[in-house]
């Protein structure tokens, strides 16, 4: 059995880890970095860039560079959060046929967020494979604890598209708790994991206990906001810079995708700098131009101003902490340790708000960028049998139920129920002689069904005619360890049953996933060919340069026919390099190598001939010296002055 890798698929950055010699190890990517930007770009020549290379070219290719797509995954286009995002990103977001939010390139190619996420997962998979020297097919992938069923299913689909069998979907705060608590001694304790990442926020209250020699991680309660994170903090800075520039120059930079992308990079840098300094300067020369000429943006930003801009966002993260504590039946003073996870927790204002709420300083010995991936790898080790005596008891973050008469949401499984779990409830018909019932499955906390997330609708037909209230229809909910729901409805009298695995009310169909898997495979092959072509070109360019240098150095020493052959081969290769025929480039590279060897051989022979002539001259000089007779002489003193 191969390794089960742990992947933190983040909004801003992603990270991959494996169990190695009983310890979790974070693996560096091909650039030598321990985290990879969750960014995918499509270039005009058809290349797909992932990670740092995609981020570097974002300013010049904003409409085809996709970032923060985790905020779109498993969401409807009409969701308020998606509509809010449209004005903040330079790339296109549109509604797919099933109502889901998809993204679009500048040449109108449409893609599901799952496809973009799959590209990042592929990079993580390749990173692990390069380190292990073997193929990887299984993974544990983390998601925000507050992700609903649609978002979890969509994440699993992304893994499938990337060629991964997702063995488990695990909540990010729970993974961080695993990373923190696995090796810790000191008895039972309750910890709060405050996870403020690039796009999502979670808080989980977790009890770590020793039970019969087994370390048990039990999630007591979880809460959060799947549209609150570092991206929102960045957007506040961007809005401030845009407004200040508009006041000064009368130009709205929101309408310029290129300027917007430069602003995003600058805002993120400024935010990070202000975590360690009191003031920074945002300086963007030639940010735009009008009839009067180019315009430059130069704005000072203080830490105090940044904190004022994001104060409500920080406060917004504290309310779920209060709810989670209440749901767990605890007070802040009952919490032994507070763990910070996610890059945005490096902000001093966030750390202070958390310390004020829980009444204790958060721990600083957990790496906020890597803890989640490490926890995922540990869970992978548990599933593979490599990590013993660890039991993880997670919860469902939101209540699950069905719509009943009058548009009421009737809960069947309450939020914060330990998973996996099953629950059933019996319902009846609303009208006389009703032969079918529609089961509308929902997720959320609102009393009115219409305000909750619709997961699925299905019909149970063939109910025998009877007065209203007489038929007995049993609705059963079954949540697996990934937090994914299966629902069944059964007529108790006829035993007719209808089962459905929730496929995220909308989501991707099996056919779409298969197409995307095939597309990803084809692209992998295409990418491989592209890299091989680039390598062939690079090798050819190196040889062309070396050959030109050789002609300059040795051309005068060899005959014209040798130089003629080399220059002909050189010209042929230069022509081939401009094309896309790898075989032709390689063949002409070989021809030039052979011609170059004949050049070096001729030059060496010419030099040896020159050396022979020099040796002959030296011999004659030596013979002449041998013919000289030594003579005695007497020194004559000249006394004349």
Curated annotation (Swiss-Prot):
GO terms for molecular function: ATP binding; ATP-dependent protein folding chaperone; unfolded protein binding. This is Chaperone protein DnaK. It comes from Xanthomonas oryzae pv. oryzae (strain KACC10331 / KXO85). Keywords: ATP-binding, Chaperone, Nucleotide-binding, Phosphoprotein, Stress response. It comes from the Bacteria. The gene is dnaK. It holds the Pfam family HSP70. Residues 605-623 have a biased composition (Low complexity). Acts as a chaperone. InterPro entries: ATPase_NBD, Chaperone_DnaK, Heat_shock_70_CS, HSP70_C_sf, HSP70_peptide-bd_sf, Hsp_70_fam. PROSITE patterns: HSP70_1, HSP70_2, HSP70_3.
């Amino acid at each position: 059995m191969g390794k089960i890798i742990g992947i933190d698929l983040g909004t801003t950055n992603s990270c991959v880890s494996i169990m190695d010699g009983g310890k979790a190890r974070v693996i560096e990517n091909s650039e030598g970095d321990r985290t990879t930007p969750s960014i995918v770009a499509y270039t005009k020549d058809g290349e797909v860039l992932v990670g740092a290379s995609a981020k570097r070219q974002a300013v010049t290719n904003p409409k085809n560079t996709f970032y923060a797509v985790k905020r779109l995954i498993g969401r409807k286009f009409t969701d308020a959060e998606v509509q809010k995002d449209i004005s903040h990103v330079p790339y296109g977001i549109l509604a797919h046929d099933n109502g889901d939010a998809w993204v679009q390139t500048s040449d109108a190619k449409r893609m599901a967020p799952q496809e973009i996420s799959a590209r990042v997962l592929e990079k993580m998979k390749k990173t692990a494979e390069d380190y292990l020297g073997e193929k990887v097919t299984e993974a544990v992938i983390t998601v925000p604890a507050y992700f609903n069923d649609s978002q979890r299913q969509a994440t699993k689909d992304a893994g499938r598209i990337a060629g991964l069998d997702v063995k488990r979907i695990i909540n990010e705060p729970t993974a961080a708790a695993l990373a923190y608590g696995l090796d810790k001694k000191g008895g039972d304790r309750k910890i709060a994991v405050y996870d403020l990442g690039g796009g999502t926020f979670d808080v989980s209250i977790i009890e770590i206990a020793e039970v019969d020699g087994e370390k048990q991680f039990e999630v007591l309660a979880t809460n959060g906001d799947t549209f609150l994170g570092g991206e929102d903090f960045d957007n506040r800075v961007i809005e401030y810079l845009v407004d200040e520039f508009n006041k000064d120059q009368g130009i709205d930079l929101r309408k310029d995708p290129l300027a917007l992308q430069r602003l995003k990079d600058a805002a993120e840098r400024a935010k990070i700098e202000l975590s360690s300094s009191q003031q920074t300067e945002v300086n963007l020369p030639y940010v735009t131009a009008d009839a009067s000429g180019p315009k430059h943006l130069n704005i000072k930003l203080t830490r105090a101003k940044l904190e004022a801009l994001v104060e409500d966002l920080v406060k917004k993260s504290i309310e779920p902490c209060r709810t989670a504590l209440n749901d767990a039946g605890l007070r802040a003073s009952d919490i032994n340790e507070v763990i910070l996870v996610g890059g945005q927790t490096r902000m001093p204002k966030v750390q202070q708000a958390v310390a004020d709420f829980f009444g204790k300083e958060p721990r600083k010995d957990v790496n906020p960028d890597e803890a989640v991936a490490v926890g995922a790898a540990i869970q992978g080790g548990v599933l593979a049998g490599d990590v013993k005596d660890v039991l993880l008891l997670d919860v469902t973050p939101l209540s699950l139920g069905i719509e009943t008469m009058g548009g009421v949401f009737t809960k069947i499984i309450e939020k914060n129920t330990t998973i996996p779990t099953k629950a059933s409830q019996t319902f009846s018909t609303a009208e006389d002689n009703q032969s079918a019932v529609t089961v509308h499955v929902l997720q959320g906390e609102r009393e009115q069904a219409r305000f909750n997330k619709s997961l699925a609708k299905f019909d149970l037909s063939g109910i025998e005619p009877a007065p209203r209230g007489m038929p007995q229809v049993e609705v059963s909910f079954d949540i697996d360890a990934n937090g994914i729901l299966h629902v069944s409805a059964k007529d108790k009298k006829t035993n007719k049953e209808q089962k459905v695995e929730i496929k995220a009310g909308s989501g991707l169909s099996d056919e779409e996933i298969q197409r995307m898997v095939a597309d990803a495979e084809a692209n992998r092959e295409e990418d491989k060919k592209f890299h091989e072509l680039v390598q062939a070109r690079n090798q050819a360019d190196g040889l062309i340069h070396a050959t030109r240098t050789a002609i300059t150095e040795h051309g005068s020493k060899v005959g014209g026919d040798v130089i003629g052959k080399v220059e002909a081969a050189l010209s042929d290769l230069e022509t081939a390099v401009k094309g896309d025929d790898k075989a032709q480039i390689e063949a002409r590279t070989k021809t030039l190598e052979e011609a170059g060897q004949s050049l070096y051989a001729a030059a060496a022979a010419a030099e040896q001939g020159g050396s022979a002539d020099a040796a002959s001259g030296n011999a004659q000089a030596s013979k002449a010296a041998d013919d000289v007779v030594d003579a005695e002489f007497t020194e004559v003193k000249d006394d004349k002055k």
